[in-house]
């Protein structure tokens, strides 16, 4: 899978731990089927990627798709992959949870049955199949919690019957992605169903630099003698600073303790890309005004960070603390105190 990241969005760069776990869950069972049988080891039925939004869950799933499409799987179960078998390619079926919700009675259940029927048909030909469900929390919400509708309470049993039913899911694996794992019905997450749960958290400093490196490259208009990687490092260290200039607000946890929240605490791969895009947009506008290629400089990048910081800080005054903390994968927050 890691080799396929080159062709994917690089907001998952340097996520070796997450990639390693999903490789063990998805790639190993398909590539070494005979060894799994030799050790009487059942591959997991499903994997759940969860964590705060904008940090590469869907991109990791795309990397899985690329790996499947490249082939190289043990189609006959003898553990050997011959040149001919190398062309046995996997199938990746992708759907967003909200797309399956339908106001007509029984229609959502029919769509779920159809997806798994297609998966079984393709798996019967010896192709490994991954069914990817994005925004899984919108489809499989906890029953009886007061946040699920009548439609959703019938969808969960249908989904579970596809996983556990009489028709086996040989050669089929389900991957789900969710920002709100707390809203998914616990029955879906029990052992024997979505066995592997992988948290895709916020990027650390070195990961953030690798992400920005993908969008700040040496072929862009830069000042003479300026290295794009050095610009990335300067940008990230500005974002991850914990001084007053990057202070968003103070938050009160359930135990009553207050602590400061900084821009670094809410950063995501999507935010990093957005900041770089802000700087590029500024450069484009200045280039239009001057008729020259305006270089991406430290001051230009700093201005982009400042714009992102101000927008994020101002938005904190209007959020619901409990809901905001859940969506962003944080411990529960009782109150938010912003600067006057």
Each model region followed by its residue ranges:
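Conserved C-terminal "switch" segment of AAA+ ATPases
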Residues: 70-90, 167-170, 187, 201-271, ...
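Conserved alpha-helical scaffold flanking the Walker A/P-loop in AAA+ ATPase domains
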Residues: 79, 107-131, 154-166
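Flexible beta-alpha connector loops of hexameric P-loop NTPases
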Residues: 79, 83-86, 97-110, 139-154, ...
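Pre-Walker A (pre-P-loop) alpha-helix and adjacent loop at the N terminus of AAA/AAA+ ATPase modules
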Residues: 13-45
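C-terminal engagement/docking regions of AAA+ P-loop ATPases
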Residues: 39, 173, 251-340
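Single conserved hydrophobic/aromatic residue that forms the stacking wall/gate
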Residues: 1-7, 12
């Amino acid at each position: 899978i890691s080799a396929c990241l080159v062709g994917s969005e690089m907001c998952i760069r340097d996520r070796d731990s997450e990639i390693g776990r999903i490789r063990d869950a998805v790639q190993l069972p398909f590539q070494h089927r005979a060894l799994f049988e030799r050790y009487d080891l059942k591959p997991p039925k499903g994997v759940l990627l969860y964590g705060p939004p904008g940090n590469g869950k869907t991109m990791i799933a795309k990397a899985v798709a690329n790996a499947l499409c490249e082939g190289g799987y043990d189609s006959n179960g003898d553990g050997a992959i011959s040149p001919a078998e190398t062309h046995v390619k996997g199938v990746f079926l992708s759907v967003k949870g909200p797309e399956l919700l339908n106001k007509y009675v029984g229609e959502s259940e029919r769509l779920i049955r159809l997806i798994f029927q297609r998966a079984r048909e393709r798996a019967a030909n010896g192709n490994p199949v991954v069914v990817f469900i994005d925004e899984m929390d919108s489809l499989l919400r906890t029953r009886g919690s007061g946040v699920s509708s009548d439609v959703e309470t019938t969808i969960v049993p249908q989904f579970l019957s596809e996983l556990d039913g009489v028709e086996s899911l040989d050669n089929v694996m389900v991957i789900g992605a969710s920002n709100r794992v707390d809203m998914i019905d616990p029955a879906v997450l029990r052992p024997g169903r979505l066995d592997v749960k992988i948290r895709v958290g916020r990027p650390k400093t070195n990961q953030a630099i690798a992400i920005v490196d993908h969008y700040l490259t040496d072929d862009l208009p830069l000042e003479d003698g300026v290295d794009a990687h050095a610009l990335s490092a300067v940008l990230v260290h500005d974002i991850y600073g914990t001084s007053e200039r990057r202070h968003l607000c103070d938050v009160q946890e359930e135990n009553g303790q207050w602590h400061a929240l900084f821009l670094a605490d809410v950063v995501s791969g999507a935010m990093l890309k957005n900041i770089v895009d802000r700087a590029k947009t500024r450069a484009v506008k200045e280039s239009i005004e001057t008729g020259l290629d305006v270089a991406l400089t430290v001051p230009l990048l700093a201005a982009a960070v400042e714009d992102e910081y101000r927008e994020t800080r101002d938005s904190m005054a209007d959020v619901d603390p409990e809901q905001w903390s859940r969506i962003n994968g944080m411990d529960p927050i009782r109150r938010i105190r912003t600067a006057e």
